[in-house]
C-alpha cells in the first residue's frame, strides 16, 4: 500500500511498524496534488481544507480522526513595517499575497480576518503563486496569479504587496506579524469558536481501503501517538476533534468554497 506521511514524533513508530510503502517526500504538502489529482496513495497525510475541497469535488477519500499537524495561524500574516502602519481591519483594497488561495493556512487566515476583524474578503486583492491542490477549484475574481519566478517575500519587501501569509515570518528586519499579539488573538479565537486548535494536516485513506484495514492503521497511529507522549496539539478521535473539525468546516463554507456545511460524521463515512 503506497503512503504519504511526514516525519513527526506522532508518526515515528507508525512509520517503523506499519509496513506501508512510504513515498520519499520530505515536505508532504509538495505531494498533495499527487494525492487528490493522481490518486497515487491509498493512505496519505492531507491538509484539512484540501480534504474538504476534495470531498466537495467527489474525490474518493475518507478521513481518519488523527491530527498530525496543527497550529494557530494568527502569526503567519505579515506586513512590511518600513512602509508605515497597517492593521488587519485596513486590508480592504490592499494586496495580500499567499502561496495558493485554497491552501489551509490561507483559508484559516481569511476566516480570522472576516470573523475577528470584520474584513470584507471580496474587497481584498489576493495575490497567489501556485495552482490549487484540487484541480477543479477556481480562485475568486479578486485573486490574481503571479507568473513563475515571482517570490512572495521579495514582493512584500519591495512594497509590491501590502501583506502576505508566510509559513514562517522572519524574526528580524522590517517584516512583522500584522496581528500584533498572535498568541492572545489565538486565545480569543479559541474562546469564540470553542475549538481547541486550528487543524492543519490529518490523514485520509482511499475509499477502496477496507474498514478493517483503515481501523488497523488508525489503531497503530494511536499507538504511535501514545509512544510520543500523546501531545495535546495532535488530538486523535472523532469526539476529541468534533469542534476542531466543525470550526474548519465553518471557515471554508463561510467563504463559499464548499457547497454546503458537511457534518463531522460525513467526513468519516
Q: How does the language model describe each region?
A:
Residues 204, 209-259:
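Secondary-structure end/capping motifs
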Residues 2, 7-119, 126-133:
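Short, glycine-/small- and polar/acidic-enriched structural segments
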Residues 141-228:
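Pocket-lining segment of extracytoplasmic ligand-binding domains
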Residues 198-200, 257-269:
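Conserved C-terminal helix/tail region of periplasmic/extracytoplasmic solute-binding proteins
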Residues 55, 156-160, 249, 253:
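Alpha-helix C-terminal capping/helix-coil junction sites
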Residues 23-37, 86, 124-157, 240, ...:
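Short helix-initiation/N-cap motifs at beta->coil->alpha
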Amino acid at each position: 500500500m503506497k503512503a504519504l506521511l511526514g516525519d513527526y514524533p506522532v508518526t515515528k513508530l507508525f512509520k517503523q511498524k506499519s509496513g506501508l510503502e512510504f513515498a520519499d517526500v520530505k515536505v508532504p504538502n509538495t505531494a498533495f496534488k499527487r494525492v487528490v489529482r493522481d490518486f497515487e496513495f491509498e493512505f496519505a497525510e492531507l491538509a484539512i481544507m484540501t480534504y474538504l475541497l476534495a470531498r466537495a469535488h467527489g474525490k474518493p477519500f475518507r478521513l481518519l480522526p488523527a491530527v498530525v499537524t496543527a497550529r494557530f495561524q494568527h502569526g503567519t500574516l505579515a506586513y512590511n513595517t518600513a512602509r508605515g502602519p497597517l492593521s488587519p481591519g485596513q486590508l480592504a483594497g490592499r494586496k495580500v499575497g499567499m502561496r495558493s488561495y485554497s491552501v489551509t493556512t490561507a483559508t484559516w487566515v481569511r476566516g480570522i480576518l472576516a470573523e475577528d476583524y470584520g474584513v470584507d474578503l471580496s474587497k481584498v486583492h489576493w495575490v497567489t503563486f501556485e495552482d490549487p491542490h484540487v484541480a477543479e477549484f477556481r480562485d475568486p475574481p479578486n485573486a490574481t496569479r503571479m507568473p513563475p519566478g515571482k517570490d512572495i517575500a521579495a514582493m512584500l519587501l519591495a512594497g509590491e504587496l501590502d501583506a502576505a501569509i508566510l509559513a514562517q515570518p522572519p524574526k528580524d528586519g522590517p517584516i512583522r506579524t500584522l496581528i500584533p499579539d498572535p498568541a492572545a488573538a489565538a486565545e480569543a479565537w479559541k474562546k469564540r469558536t470553542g475549538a481547541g486548535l486550528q487543524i492543519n494536516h490529518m490523514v485520509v485513506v482511499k475509499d477502496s481501503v477496507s474498514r478493517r484495514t483503515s481501523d488497523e492503521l488508525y489503531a497503530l497511529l494511536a499507538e504511535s501517538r501514545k509512544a510520543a507522549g500523546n501531545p495535546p496539539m495532535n488530538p486523535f478521535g472523532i469526539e476529541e476533534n468534533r469542534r476542531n473539525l466543525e470550526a474548519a468546516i465553518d471557515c471554508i463554507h463561510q467563504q463559499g468554497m464548499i457547497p454546503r456545511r458537511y457534518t463531522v460524521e460525513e467526513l468519516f463515512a
